[in-house]
Amino acid sequence: PIAGSMVLAAILLKLGGYGMIRIIQILPSSKTDMFIPFITLSLWGAVLANLTCLQQTDLKSLIAYSSISHMGLVVAAISIQTQWSLSGAMALMIAHGFTSSALFCLANTSYERTHTRILILTRGFHNILPMTTTWWLLSNLMNIATPPMMNFTSEFLILSSLFNWCPTTIILLSLSILITSIYSLHIFLSTQMGPTLLNTQTEPAHSREHLLMTLHIIPLILLSMKPELVM
């Protein structure tokens, strides 16, 4: 069920990161070196999860792997134990909670009309549901951390913290950000552009779907205007 995926991505997945933040506070802050394996594996795992996203043909699986890649950045940031990295990790968990939940909601919007999650079969929605295309565009822009969204603020804090800790990490971080932009653009073009393959009449977008997306986008925009509330 799509509701389960939304709750899993927005709340349950982030509880693990929040638990790490709480546990890390009781450990000596000078023992950052003991977390080097975790930082390395989390960054490498984020890159591999992003590469897996490029191979996915199932829309729901693609969004799920996207959540895994973002949590890799969160784990790396928490392990460094600096003020900037912890603030960035907390902000990214909240921002990506809204973003991934919105993407799952949009994926269900497409599934209810096409009864498939295969990307190549869900194309052409720009001509059928133009307002939904706007929601897709905003959600993908948030997913790639476009300014001035809180996603950008959080990823900038994490990137700065990791680069200050070890400049070599910029290689994996840059690769992860690049691949995220590629598959986010791939999602948008695959679902919205091109000729539609639907032969039956498609029902228009419901007000409940627009309300759901509004309740995802507006709070994130408001938090982006005042990010110190969660950092």
Swiss-Prot record:
Keyword annotations: Electron transport, Membrane, Mitochondrion, NAD, Respiratory chain, Translocase, Transmembrane, Transmembrane helix, Transport, Ubiquinone
Gene Ontology terms for molecular function: NADH dehydrogenase (ubiquinone) activity; ubiquinone binding
Catalytic EC class: translocase
Translocase among keywords: yes
Originating gene: MT-ND4
Cellular location(s): Mitochondrion membrane
Transmembrane segments: 1-21, 34-54, 62-82, 86-106, 118-138, 169-189, 211-231
Reactions it catalyzes: a ubiquinone + NADH + 5 H(+)(in) = a ubiquinol + NAD(+) + 4 H(+)(out)
GO cellular component: mitochondrial membrane
Protein name, UniProt field: NADH-ubiquinone oxidoreductase chain 4
Function: Core subunit of the mitochondrial membrane respiratory chain NADH dehydrogenase (Complex I) that is believed to belong to the minimal assembly required for catalysis. Complex I functions in the transfer of electrons from NADH to the respiratory chain. The immediate electron acceptor for the enzyme is believed to be ubiquinone.
Gene Ontology terms: biological process: ATP synthesis coupled electron transport; electron transport coupled proton transport
First and last residue of the signal peptide: none
